[in-house]
Each structure stands twice: as structure tokens, then as C-alpha cells.
Amino acid sequence: MPLLTQQIQDEDDQYSLVASLDNVRNLSTILKAIHFREHATCFATKNGIKVTVENAKCVQANAFIQAGIFQEFKVQEESVTFRINLTVLLDCLSIFGSSPMPGTLTALRMCYQGYGYPLMLFLEEGGVVTVCKINTQEPEETLDFDFCSTNVINKIILQSEGLREAFSELDMTSEVLQITMSPDKPYFRLSTFGNAGSSHLDYPKDSDLMEAFHCNQTQVNRYKISLLKPSTKALVLSCKVSIRTDNRGFLSLQYMIRNEDGQICFVEYYCCPDEEVPESES
């Protein structure tokens, strides 16, 4: 990235965060997977960047971009946090077009000086450099879903194609998606209760799509479909998905996404259960 490197290398010390990518799509694609609200909170540490989006204190999405994804990654402080308009950020990241010509890459250098300063984006394609300044905001406290691995009751790992098919067939007239996880039959079941009646989709634990099955007790929980719907953006991009429920019925959907360079990033959705399940419908 010669132009960008020469232009700003000397100024690095004034920034609390500097991150460079040879291919901006390795960032923008992951951010699109959690873009269901306008604003996001960004957390940067030496391990990478976490971008968090929340809705109605019931659902939270986190995109993790590890430091190793970047060609250059520097964080001067222990942690750097700011809130940003995610819609504007994505518009800037695709300023040269969202689907460039084959073989053409847009390079990115992202710099943040600290509290009260804008996020600076330097984008370069074919020798042309565009500079964007995006105002940052006071970071709001994000929800702590307290989803601890020691409290996980049930966990399965599925190839994403199996869940993509299921989600495309869900009855969207149903307000809720009921998830049953059990050490015994039906093992893993997705149920909806729509205008046409109830429908169930079962996955045997020995299915070719099932990569891991660790269910300790039967759990039946309901989640608002409207809250789960945004997670299908991540599902479409992912190759595997880990589905976990804890002792409170909270749901974790962790999507493994491979970028254009074959590197792995993760997007995680947390969702709280909707209600107690009526005995007659379970």
C-alpha cells in the first residue's frame, strides 16, 4: 500500500488505533452481517476489533475481526472504545463500489486518534486515494448477556447449509421460533406456529450436517423470529454455526465466516428467550 504507507507512516504515534487491510471487503463483509441497526460500538484491543450492535435489550450481535486479519494493527492503549454510525461506515468502505472489477482490490488504512476525534478512513484503489472522516460518539454501555461456557447446557455445531435451508422454509407468520435440544429424540428440533398451523423440522444427531452434538438435558425455548431474522445475514456468509443454550434459556448463535483470503472471523448473536412454553404446544 505505497501511497497510504508513505502518506501516514510518520503520523502513527498520534493515533490510539491504526489498522490496515489490503482488501477492504475482509472488513465490510463481516460488518454487513451485523448491520441491522444504525449504530454500533467498537472495541479495539491488541487481539483485534469487536463491533457490537444491539436491539431492544433482547438481542446482541458481535463481529470479531482478529488482529491477524489486518496487514498492520496497532493499539496504543489497553483498549479503545467508540460508538459510530455503522450505516455511514459501510457506505464509506464501499466508496469505490461494492462489487469491483475482478482482480481489483480497495486497500484501507483506518486511524483513530482517541476520544472526541473522528475515525479516519484512507481508501486506495488503482492509485486513487479517498479520505473519509466519520464522527464518533460517546460509547454506550453494552448489554452483558453473561453467557458463560460453564452454564451452557446444550451445544451443537451444524454445517451452515443445513440451517440456511431450514430458515428459508420457516413459516414467517409465526411470531416465535421454538428450539428443542435434547439428548433423546427429537435431538434438535425447530418449530413454528403460524397461520397454517404448527410445523417441525428435526435434525438427527447422526445427520451428515451435524458436526458436534453435546446435549445434556432437554430444553424447549422460544425466541421472537423478528429478533432472530437479522442473524440470517451472518448465516448466509458462514460455513459452520455453533448453537448453544444456557441454564436460563439464552441462545448463542456463533457463525464461522471465511473471508476472501481464507481467514476465519466470527459473528455471534445472543438472544434472550421469549416466554415460558405452553405445555400443550411443546
Swiss-Prot record:
A GO MF annotation of the entry reads: double-stranded DNA 3'-5' DNA exonuclease activity
Name the InterPro entries for this protein. Answer: Cell_cycle_checkpoint_Rad1, DNA_clamp_sf, Rad1_Rec1_Rad17
User: What's a single GO BP term from this record?
Assistant: DNA damage checkpoint signaling
UniProt entry keywords in alphabetical sequence: DNA damage, DNA repair, Nucleus
> Listed GO cellular component terms?
checkpoint clamp complex; chromosome; intracellular membrane-bounded organelle; nucleoplasm
Cellular compartments annotated:
Nucleus
Main localization category:
nucleus
Q: Does the keyword Transport apply?
A: no
The function of this protein is: Component of the 9-1-1 cell-cycle checkpoint response complex that plays a major role in DNA repair. The 9-1-1 complex is recruited to DNA lesion upon damage by the RAD17-replication factor C (RFC) clamp loader complex. Acts then as a sliding clamp platform on DNA for several proteins involved in long-patch base excision repair (LP-BER).
Give the multimer and partner information.
Component of the toroidal 9-1-1 (RAD9-RAD1-HUS1) complex, composed of RAD9A, RAD1 and HUS1. The 9-1-1 complex associates with LIG1, POLB, FEN1, RAD17, HDAC1, RPA1 and RPA2. The 9-1-1 complex associates with the RAD17-RFC complex. RAD1 interacts with POLB, FEN1, HUS1, HUS1B, RAD9A and RAD9B. Interacts with DNAJC7. Interacts with RHNO1; interaction is direct.
Family in the record: Belongs to the rad1 family.
Q: What is this protein called?
A: Cell cycle checkpoint protein RAD1
Q: Which organism is it from?
A: Homo sapiens (Human)
